[in-house]
Amino acid sequence: DVRQRDFLRYHKYEKMTLSLDEVTDKILQDEHFRRVPYLKNHVDTCAQTGQLILPLTVDEKVSQIIYRKDPLQQKTIVEGQRSDGISQLINTGNILTGMLADCFTDVDIYQDQVRLLQYPFTSPISSASAISFYRYFIVDTLMVERDKCYRIDFTPNNPQDFGFSGSLFIMADSTWRVRSAEIGIPSRSDVNFVREMRVMQDFHTLPTGEQVVTSSRMLVRMALASWIQKVQVERVVHCSGWDFA
């Protein structure tokens, strides 16, 4: 864990894209969209879901994260920020803001418990309870960029349990470290605004030996109680320039 270091500094790039999900001709004929007819030219296909989406807003931020262990202190210095899109179409107030705060928390699978949507999830590599909670399947041997990895799929032992499902890509060497992870959660009646959530992460080993997340992509499909009923929010994060001095 890099936070065991006395001092830590790194650069962080974040991009959040809010899109209308499952776009149809009927939706584009809504009075809200008739005011901006050029939008139909921006309809695209989501690579992860295969659904038609219409990007509405894009927010980007570049920042520097500074962490000190003792006394405990963390500071975020925003170095650049940009917003683009048609926010006037999606004036959903604090409702959407609260939903995004619940969804887009940082995921650390190296912790025994991962908290998302106000629920604790057992990490698929938890040293405490993963073996008893999940069932694992060795699926394939493949390359992740230049690294030979084993693909291991996992799902809760009990289908009734609320846990992650997905794939781990484990380094095929003596370290057995996680090279990449793709995890998702099922829909649930008491988390009714989230229809689907996927998290994809890439890990790298620093020259100093620590394992860090260098890129993360989180995709959340939501159901809103407004005229925009289905939205997709994608958050992409890239971290670089790790410094411990």
Residue ranges of predicted features:
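Surface-exposed extracellular loop regions of Gram-negative outer-membrane beta-barrel proteins
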Residues: G163, A172-G184
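Structured extracytoplasmic
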Residues: D1-R151, T155-G163, A225-A245
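Short aromatic loop motif centered on NTY/YTY
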Residues: G184-P186, V191-V233
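Extended, regular secondary-structure scaffolds
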Residues: V62, R179, M197, H204-P207, ...
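Extended lipid/amphipathic-ligand handling interfaces
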Residues: R3, G166-D173, R198-T208
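Short structured motifs
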Residues: Y134-D140, S165-S167, G184-P186, R198-M200
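Solvent-exposed coil/turn segments that connect beta secondary-structure elements
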Residues: T141, N157, D173-S174, P186
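Short, hydrophobic/aromatic-rich segments at coil-to-beta transitions
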Residues: E145-D153, R177-E182, E210-S215
